[in-house]
A protein has these predicted regions:
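Conserved redox-active cysteine motifs that mediate thiol-disulfide chemistry
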Residues: 30, 35-50
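Short beta-strand segments
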Residues: 34, 66-69
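Short, internal strand/loop/helix patches
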Residues: 66, 80-120
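A short beta-strand-turn-helix
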Residues: 10-31, 57-58
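Extracellular/luminal regions of secreted and cell-surface proteins that mediate adhesion/ECM remodeling
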Residues: 149-204
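Thiol-/selenol-based redox modules, centered on thioredoxin-like
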Residues: 113, 119-161
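Surface-exposed loop/edge segments in extracytoplasmic proteins
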Residues: 17-20, 126-128, 203-204
């Protein structure tokens, strides 16, 4: 959902280059993620428009643009056409292109339709900025408005936040609580020490 923390992933594009989401975000660049399927008509129509290609040409130094074939039932070879694929996707997508089963086979990105387009900020928060047929009406201007209307907070020296919490939400005073938390630092400085305090009814 919007405002949640984007799960990390590593993809290998069709040129054999590996890209890890968090490493890209740590460079201070937002990531524009287009999740599509090779059999999806609206996905093909949108790709043919060349909006993402044009956006990448103009804003590629500020935003990392990537298209991922996310249907776990289709092999990477389907990107080049053949049975079950609308056509050769390398003819219509000229920015970073990959096939990845993990993204589509998990519920992490809540894929309910193709295409689904996410903007992921350097602080790892994710926003859905487009889906389905609506993206077919975009131009580079409207896409830029969609992207830059979502203001990503600038990276600071240290920016620590809790990414997940796994424990009981209620405590009746008996026994002990052993919470499991995941924290992340989206700043550009390394954390050398960290203190975590647990409060119960406002008391440490």
């Amino acid at each position: 959902p919007n405002g949640s923390i984007a799960p990390n992933f590593t993809i290998t594009d069709i040129n054999g280059e590996s890209h890890q989401l968090y490493e890209l975000l740590d460079q201070g660049k937002p990531v524009l993620l287009d999740l599509f399927a090779v059999w999806c008509g609206p996905c093909w129509n949108f790709a043919e428009l060349g909006v993402f290609d044009d956006f990448n040409e103009v804003y590629g130094n500020s935003v990392f643009v990537v298209a991922v074939e996310a249907d776990p039932t289709t092999p990477e070879s389907s990107l080049y056409g053949g049975s079950g694929s609308i056509g050769d996707w390398t003819d219509v997508i000229h920015y970073t292109l990959a096939n990845d089963d993990f993204i589509g086979d998990s519920s992490l990105y809540n894929l309910n339709y193709y295409p689904t387009i996410y903007l992921i900020c350097p602080d790892r928060t994710v926003s859905e900025i487009g889906q389905g047929p609506s993206s077919g009406y975009w131009s580079i201007q409207t896409l830029a408005e969609e992207v830059f209307n979502y203001t990503c907070d600038p990276m600071t020296g240290i920016n620590v936040g809790m990414q997940s919490y796994n424990s009981e939400l209620e405590y009746c005073g008996d026994g002990k609580i052993e919470p499991i938390v995941t924290i992340s630092n989206t700043g550009f400085e390394t954390i050398t020490a960290l203190t975590i305090q647990t409060l119960i009814d406002g008391d440490v």
